[in-house]
From Swiss-Prot:
Miscellaneous remark of the record: Present with 846 molecules/cell in log phase SD medium.
Residue segments, region Disordered: 98-123
A Pfam family assignment: PUF
Name of protein: mRNA-binding protein puf3
The gene coding this protein: puf3
Main localization, broad class: mitochondrion
Compartment(s) where it occurs, according to its Swiss-Prot or TrEMBL record: Mitochondrion outer membrane; Cytoplasm
Cellular component annotations (GO), alphabetically ordered: cytoplasm; cytoplasmic stress granule; cytosol; mitochondrial outer membrane; P-body
CDD domains: Pumilio (cd07920)
Species this chain originates from: Schizosaccharomyces pombe (strain 972 / ATCC 24843) (Fission yeast)
């Protein structure tokens, strides 16, 4: 058993959560490393990182440790040497429990100022050296200025270790107390807490006078790197994350989950006030505000608990003009300033009973554990979420329209009501929207839908006001994820003259919008809704790069809309693309443009593409992207051209094998054969099946051949079922 005995009661808990033992470096000259082989310090926490790690008065002093097994105060055969690290803790390897380590006062001496036990106490047990922890990957970092105080496994055992086994490296599961899993504790813990224990919680805290790690006090004395922590007085409780013993410091009692509206602290009477003031006693990393991220609820001691967030100035956003409220959407009242409301709780006194007055601004918004700003809410919005049975109208939310617009369910409520609202109700809601920054609302994830509804259901005056807000910002809105939707809706519902004014702001930014994941939708909507004569600046920008944009993930969409809607310019666009058809057919995005030409192009355009397909039928049919074009070609060509494809597949060979057999076994070309079966007349289909059916046994061996077999069987069943019907008609 390994027992930690803290030699410095004032040593602070400064070990970080998931780092090794990074002691502050010190010059070699300032350290006395003599006699390290006799008594070596353990890797326990030192003083605070912000303070000096070494004390000059302690470095130069001599320390006396007794030999022998006598546990009384007699000092026999003392060995004196200089300890360079007086704040470290020594380990005992004799297997005794902490209770057997009795501390007794030491008589004053001349060099008492260097005693590593300032309280006048020292251990009576002999302290053999720690051995061979150097190779342990968990404990392997030491100051560069210090000699590594560990014996290698290959080294011979010194005389001071003659009484120990030759291989004394302890298992990781036995280090630093009683750990019951392979995860172990990465960091030794002094476990000497300045706090008084919580009532009935001796399994978690220790006495202020004795550092203990035995099973009597800590069945598992650390939760670092462990999923389960077993309190002595309760059944095992599941913890989703890791923390350590002292992480009960900033937990506040609340009852949010149960919906209760009161805050009643229920701490035990012995709860020390210093516990609430302490930031973290654990080895887990802390947030910037000092709170530990691993504070967890413990139902065995506390009915409901939550982390107290830190009050922080409001973030810079359009919500600055909105009412300030607390963490969970309830504004604090100003009528009773002395009332203290714990963050994350809902006092009954602030809940409205019958009125829906606007929220009164209170303290700045709170910051949650992830550093995100809490959405500021009003009383009405809270009741809207809390009371699902109440029937709300637009008149009930007046004064809170912007807040509702930026809320998911509130925005949906406004959208539904605006579709059937009266003109007066729409105007009242619109006045609140227009009085704020509409641009910010247009770029909001939920607010943009409310603005869109006013382009759809609003009157001309309201549309003009919104257009005045958009003017000068069309390009920036077009590149924004939610703002581009508002611009599209505006183009769709405003008058033609306003459409031209709006889209003219994109002159000089056409290619920027075309190649943007959001802006390309605005260009598409403009091509769909605005006359081609007013879009010449767009077509001029597209024409020199039209074959390049056709292979662009966003540009290909714009080219398809141009081919579909720009009738006067369609011929010029296709003529620019025809020399690049074969390359575009094999492109991941360009193949969609070629398919669009087959669907909307002239017969001469289709004929040109078909001739290219028939010349490279096998290659294109086995291509991942080009096979889509071949399938589309089969659907849109004439029966005569389709017969040409069938004859080529049946008659020609490649690599001493029929093209049909190669295509049936290919993972892409087999879909071309299936498409040919679907699109061909019955006579040609039966001919194709007659060539496929003899190879059914071979196709069963291929994964993709099985799909074709299913199609063949389906058509054969149709043919068989059709024969009796013809026979019955002949008999009649």
């Amino acid at each position: 058993m390994f027992t930690a005995v803290n030699s410095n009661p004032n040593a602070s808990e400064s070990i970080s959560g998931n780092s090794a033992f990074n002691f502050p470096s010190a010059p070699v000259s300032s350290l006395d490393t003599n006699n390290y082989g006799q008594r070596r310090p353990s890797l326990l926490s030192g003083t605070s990182p912000t303070s000096s790690f070494f004390n000059s008065s302690m470095i130069s002093s001599n320390y006396t440790f007794p030999h022998g097994s006598n546990k009384q105060a007699s000092l026999e055969s003392p060995v004196s040497y200089s300890n360079p690290i007086p704040s470290l803790t020594w380990l005992s390897l004799d297997g005794d429990s902490p209770d057997s380590l009795v501390s007794t006062p030491t008589a004053p001496s001349a060099n008492h100022h260097g005693n590593p036990f300032p309280n006048g106490k020292q251990s009576i047990k002999a302290m053999p050296s720690l051995v061979n922890l150097q190779e342990d990957s968990v404990i392997s970092k030491f100051p560069n200025s210090l000699e590594v105080p560990f014996r290698k496994r290959s080294e011979s055992t010194s005389s001071s270790l003659s009484g120990l086994h030759s291989d004394l490296r302890p298992l990781k599961t036995e280090l630093y107390g009683q750990l019951n899993s392979e995860c172990g504790a990465r960091f030794p813990q002094t476990l000497k807490s300045p706090l008084t224990p919580i009532g009935g919680d001796s399994a978690r805290t220790v006495s202020a006078s004795t550092a203990r790690t035995s099973d009597k006090f800590f069945p598992r004395h650390t939760r670092a790197h462990s999923d389960f922590w077993i309190p002595a007085t309760s059944k095992p409780s599941r913890h989703a994350s890791h923390s350590s013993i002292g992480d009960l410091t900033t937990i506040t009692q609340s009852s949010i989950s149960s919906g209760s509206g009161s805050f009643k602290p229920s701490w035990d009477g012995s709860f020390d006030s210093s516990l609430m003031a302490h930031q973290s006693y654990g080895t887990s990393p802390a947030f910037a505000n000092g709170n530990s991220p691993t504070l967890k609820n413990d139902s065995s001691f506390f009915g409901s608990a939550s982390v107290r967030p830190t009050v922080s100035p409001i973030g810079t956003s359009f919500r600055q003009s909105l009412p300030d409220i607390s963490a969970f959407g309830i504004p604090k009242t100003e009528t009773n300033p002395s009332e203290v409301v714990a963050p994350g709780t809902i006092p009954i006194s602030v809940l409205p009973t019958s009125n829906f007055s606007a929220a009164t601004p209170a303290n700045p918004s709170l910051i949650n554990q992830n550093g995100q700003e809490f959405l500021q809410q009003s009383r009405v919005l809270y009741l809207f979420h809390a009371n699902k049975q109440r029937h709300f109208e637009l008149s009930d939310i007046l004064g809170n329209v912007v807040l509702f617009s930026t809320d998911q369910h509130g925005s949906r409520f406004i959208q539904q009501k605006l579709a059937t609202a009266t003109e007066e109700e729409r105007e009242a809601v619109f006045q609140e929207i227009a009085s704020t920054s509409c641009l910010q609302l247009m770029m909001d994830i939920f607010g943009n839908y409310v603005v869109q509804k006013y382009f759809e259901f609003g009157n001309e005056k309201q549309k003009q006001i919104l257009l005045s807000q958009i003017k000068g910002h069309v390009f920036s809105l077009s590149l924004q994820m939610y703002g581009c939707r508002v611009v599209q809706k505006a183009i769709e519902y405003i008058s033609p003259e306003h459409q031209v004014q709006l889209i003219q702001e994109l002159d000089g930014h056409v290619l920027d919008c075309v190649c943007d994941q959001n802006g390309n939708h605005v260009i598409q909507k403009a091509i769909e809704c605005i006359d081609t004569g007013h879009l010449q600046f767009i077509l001029r920008a597209l024409r020199p790069q039209i074959h390049v944009l056709s292979a662009h993930p966003y540009g290909c969409r714009v080219i398809q809309r141009a081919i579909e809607h720009c009738h006067s310019e369609r011929k010029l666009i296709i003529e620019e693309l025809l020399p690049h058809i074969l390359k575009l057919t094999q492109d991941q995005y360009g193949n969609y443009v070629v398919q669009h030409i087959l669907r909307t192009g002239s017969e001469s355009d289709k004929k040109y593409i078909f001739d290219l397909m028939i010349d490279h039928l096998l290659f294109l049919s086995c291509h991942k992207f080009a096979s889509n074009v071949v399938e589309r070609c089969i659907s849109y060509i004439s029966d005569v051209d389709r017969r040409r494809i069938l004859n080529k597949i049946i008659s020609e060979k490649a690599e001493n094998c029929s093209i049909l057999m190669l295509m049936m076994k290919d993972k892409y070309a087999n879909y071309v054969i299936q498409k040919l079966l679907d699109a061909s007349p019955e006579e040609e289909r039966d001919l194709l099946i007659s060539y496929i059916y003899p190879h059914i046994s071979v196709l069963k061996k291929f994964t993709y051949g099985k799909h074709l077999i299913m199609s063949v069987e389906r058509f054969r069943q149709k043919s068989i079922s059709a024969v009796p019907k013809l026979a019955s008609k002949e008999c009649k």
